[in-house]
Structure formats: structure tokens, C-alpha cells
Design a protein with these regions (language model features):
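Short, surface-exposed loop or secondary-structure junction motifs
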Residues: 3-217
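Residue-level signal for short, function-critical loop segments
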Residues: 69, 228-229
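A short acidic/small-residue loop/turn micro-motif
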Residues: 131, 230-232
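Electropositive phosphate-/nucleotide-binding environments in soluble metabolic enzymes
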Residues: 141-144, 233, 237
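Peripheral terminal and inter-domain segments
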Residues: 197, 234-388
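Short, well-ordered beta-strand elements
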Residues: 202, 212-228, 312-315
Length: 388
């Protein structure tokens, strides 16, 4: 109660919305500390920029919020609950979950020894272990063999749930592509369509490290991929294709009817300094998503159409919203103006320094008008920097 302060919509957020990443939250900075008090961490609420159940936008905050709900319902810390109900029953003796990894001394020590490499296989020195503040949303750290045990338990449908119907419900679609019965998400597991099968799974990424877990329930085959090399996405994407076959593409009709234009990922920072990334990182021109390397290799299948008054590309992880020409002009125009403003500030300070050196060398005093003019430039420059 009174936990979420920045809710824009009256529609309640459900646990299923959090699993489907459809609570409507903007993206949130990951480097926010390692506070062990999850309740205090959850009070740092990101803005709600979409109405619940209308847009898929991956949210670490939403996942952490689900973990906090588990704490409130169970009366245990999230880490203790997971140890008791998952790690211990499955014999996962080398996996930790707390922000400082103090719940497993072995993992805590081994984590300090981890190394990551560049694309040429050279050791990257000076890397500091990545800390994700919202620890239920990715802080789990353990060995490959523990992750394999977890994957086997999920694939064999044993130990974790007592009733068979719970397993069936867990693996059923909780969110589908609009107008189809093709699943996007199954209670937190992302669906990937291959030509001859379908997988459910999830991945995790931090600088230099990637982990992927996929389950093919139809054939009873699963895969776990862990990589500690930069550009690791190539391994995480390509290796499953060797196991499950080619990814299924969107229908010919979807590709034919797709509306080309500028699209923006729904997962964005809506305000603050990081919002600038939505212009040049999260926005791109799409003619046919099936010809876009990132979409084709990572997702394969997609649909598109009108929803809620806007045309969008429907994908796992993050939908992509089509932008109007006016939106594009405003965004890139703002970026140009911001660049000019920063250039103005740089020139003001540079000219000021050069002028001082000139007067110092020639022993000339500046007049009162020059002093007022300098103060005006410095004040304007300081205001611009403060805004940014």
C-alpha cells in the first residue's frame, strides 16, 4: 500500500502484468546500489508511461517488484524463499542471490575471480564486477552445473511443483501476439518460434557476460549457454539455432502489409539525462523487420498492426512503436539543438580562457561592458549545463 508513487493510470497492476512485462513502467537505471532492503528499493518508482496490459516493455523494476510481493506474501526475504523452495530442493549448492552474494560464501569468493575477454580472446583488465541493485531481477549468480540442474528440473517437470496442472498452467501462454494464439510469454518465460518447434526460456546479460536457458517441451530438449566474452550475443543467438533449427519468420502477408517508417522501442528512459538514448539508440528506420538483422536473428517471428490508436511492431522483450514524422522531427531537432547548446557552452568557456590569457600576457584590463558580457555568457552556460 502507498508503495508506487508514479502511477499514471488507474488500471490496477496484476502479478500477471509483471510476469508479462506489461505493467507500463519506463526503463530504469541498473546502477542504483545494492540495498538489501527490497522494500526501500521499491520506493524508487520509475514513471508509468504505458497503460497496463497494452504494451510489452521489459522492466527490471517490475521483476523486482514481483520479488517484493513474494516477500510480503511469504513473510521471508526473497533470497531465503528461493533458497528454501528452489535451490535446496534441486541441490543447487553453488548459487547465491543476495546483492552481496553473502548467502553463499563459495560463490562470493569465486565471483571475485571471474574474468571476461574481448573478441580476440584477450583478457579485459580492470573490470569491476557488475552489481544490479534490484537483486531479484538478475542478481542470481552460480555455476553452470547448478543452472543445468535448474533447467533439467524445469524440463522434466519435477520437484518444484506438486501438482501436474501447475506445470501445465506455468507453461501455458499468458500473453499472445494480437489476433493469434502464438505465445509471446508464458508466465515469465519468453517464447521463441522455430520452424519445427517452440522454446520457452529466458536470458540474462551484464557487461561481458551472457546466459541463456531454453526449453523445448515438445522434444524434451533443453539448452544452457553461458559466455564470458564481449559481443557474446553472437553465441547466445547462434548456438540455439544449431540445436532447434531455423527460427520461424513472420507470414508473407505480415511482411507485405508492414508499414515502413521510424520505430522506437517501448523500453526507454522517458525523462532525465538517459532519455537521450531513445533518439539514437532505441529509434531506427524499418522497411521490413524480417530483413533487419537484429530482429531476424534474435526473434524471427513478429506481428504488426494498430493497437490503442497507434501502429506497432509486436515482439518479445519490447514492442516497437511507429513514430509520426512530427515525432521524428521533434526528437532529432531537439538533439541538434542540444548539441548546439553544448557547443555554445564549450565555446564560451574556451573563449573566456583564451581572453584571460591574452589580457594576462599583454597586461590589459577589460572594461565594464566586457565584464557584464562575460558574466552573461558564463551564467547562460552554467544554466545549460544544469539543465543537462
Amino acid at each position: 500500500q502507498n508503495l508506487l508513487k508514479n502511477l499514471k493510470y488507474d488500471k490496477p497492476i496484476t502479478m500477471l502484468d509483471l510476469m508479462n512485462h506489461q505493467a507500463g513502467f519506463e526503463d530504469y537505471p541498473l546502477y542504483i546500489g545494492s540495498d538489501k532492503d527490497l522494500g526501500a528499493l521499491m520506493k524508487k518508482t520509475p514513471s508509468q508511461i504505458y497503460e497496463p496490459r497494452t504494451v510489452t516493455s521489459y522492466s527490471n523494476y517490475g521483476t523486482a517488484l514481483a520479488g517484493y510481493i513474494v516477500e510480503r506474501v511469504s513473510g521471508q526475504s526473497f533470497a531465503d524463499y528461493v533458497h528454501e523452495h528452489i535451490f535446496q530442493p534441486l541441490g543447487m549448492e553453488h548459487t547465491a542471490l543476495k546483492p552481496d552474494l553473502s548467502d553463499n560464501r563459495y560463490v562470493q569468493k569465486q565471483r571475485e575471480k571471474e574474468k571476461t575477454y574481448d573478441t580476440e580472446g584477450n583478457l579485459l583488465k580492470g573490470d569491476v564486477p557488475f552489481v544490479l541493485g534490484e537483486y531479484p531481477a538478475g542478481r542470481a549468480t552460480g555455476t553452470f552445473f547448478d543452472l543445468k540442474r535448474f533447467a533439467q528440473a524445469l524440463l522434466q517437470k519435477k520437484t518444484l511443483f506438486k501438482r501436474a496442472e501447475t506445470w501445465e498452467n506455468f507453461y501455458s501462454a499468458s500473453h499472445t501476439y494480437p489476433g493469434t494464439d502464438v505465445p509471446v510469454n508464458a508466465h515469465g518465460l519468453w517464447a521463441t518460434e522455430f520452424e519445427n518447434t517452440r522454446t520457452l526460456g529466458h536470458g540474462g546479460n551484464s557487461p561481458g557476460f551472457t546466459t541463456s536457458l531454453l526449453l523445448d517441451l515438445k522434444s524434451g530438449i533443453g539448452s544452457v549457454v553461458t559466455v564470458n566474452q564481449r559481443n557474446e550475443f553472437h553465441f547466445a543467438i547462434a548456438m540455439p539455432d544449431l540445436i532447434y533449427g531455423r527460427k520461424k519468420e513472420a507470414s508473407k502477408a505480415s511482411q507485405r502489409d508492414f508499414q515502413a517508417g521510424f520505430y522506437r522501442e517501448a523500453r526507454i528512459f522517458s525523462k532525465g539525462p538517459l532519455s537521450i538514448f531513445r533518439v539514437f539508440k532505441s529509434t531506427s528506420y524499418l522497411d521490413n523487420p524480417s530483413e533487419n538483422a537484429a530482429i531476424k536473428d534474435y526473434f524471427g517471428f513478429w506481428t504488426a498492426g494498430e493497437k490503442g490508436g497507434s501502429y506497432r511492431l509486436n515482439l518479445p522483450i519490447s514492442d516497437r512503436m511507429k513514430l509520426s514524422l512530427l515525432d521524428v522531427i521533434k526528437d532529432y531537432g531537439s538533439l541538434v539543438l542540444a548539441g548546439l547548446a553544448l557547443l555554445y557552452v564549450a565555446l564560451c568557456y574556451l573563449c573566456g580562457i583564451l581572453a584571460k590569457l591574452y589580457r594576462l600576457l599583454l597586461r590589459k584590463n577589460k572594461g565594464s561592458n566586457s565584464a557584464v558580457w562575460s558574466i552573461w555568457h558564463y551564467l547562460t552556460g552554467s544554466i545549460i549545463l544544469w539543465v543537462f
